[in-house]
Amino acid sequence: YNQLEDTTAMYRGGLECLKYFPNEPLPYVMISLPLLIRKDLERAKGYLEQGLALSPDNSPIKAQFFAYLGEVYYKQDRVEQAFAMFDSTLLINPGDIMTLNNYSYYLSLRNEHLDKAEKMISTALSADPNNSTFLDTYAWVLFKSKNYSLAKFYMRSAIENEKNPSGVLYEHYGDILFMNGEKEEAVKMWQKALEFRDEECGDLKYKIENGLPVDHEK
């Protein structure tokens, strides 16, 4: 459900379903996921909380509500609550690979609990070893753990396994190459990343102009 028309159809279907099954949790998933994708976070949270209250304890759908609430909270910068939701998801469904990936990546961005992050993304990769998103996350966890040579291997694999690599992948690869001493190649990757980025790219432009990451000591 990444296409706008699909999310619209899902949202409308959820509203229709809710008319007939107001006490079932499924319609609330159908409504809240499109809202989450559209970043209508408060409305998504409202439906998720209603659906969560209707979900049987320790059920797969309850785990799903916890996971989506975690995403809402994280996007609202309510990090502790987000991570508590992800922990609740994984207590019910330890093999939820999307939660394992996202939780791991968020921890790496905050440079927190990197051992836990590595275990989670390793589990996700075991289930889907050619998933470029998971490979990117694993590479980034390794990068934050200062395991630069292994990070390079996994980031290269992430790019090779993605038909249309994003600017984020190339930027990550540039950062990793830089820390492996390959500064010229790093700048090339940052330049390539800039071609794919539409939003504000101040940090990326700094890297290209100065030949080093923003927080790197000269």
Question: What does each model-found stretch correspond to?
Answer:
Residues 2, 36, 67, 74, ...:
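Position-specific recognition of the canonical hydrophobic site in helix A of tetratricopeptide repeat
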Residues 5, 39, 77, 111-112, ...:
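Residue-level detector of the short coil/turn that links helix A to helix B
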Residues 20, 54-58, 92, 127, ...:
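Structural marker of alpha-solenoid helical repeat scaffolds
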Residues 27, 61, 65, 99, ...:
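TPR alpha-solenoid repeat register
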Residues 30, 64, 68, 102, ...:
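Canonical tetratricopeptide repeat
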Residues 33, 71, 105-106, 140, ...:
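Residue-level recognition of tetratricopeptide repeat
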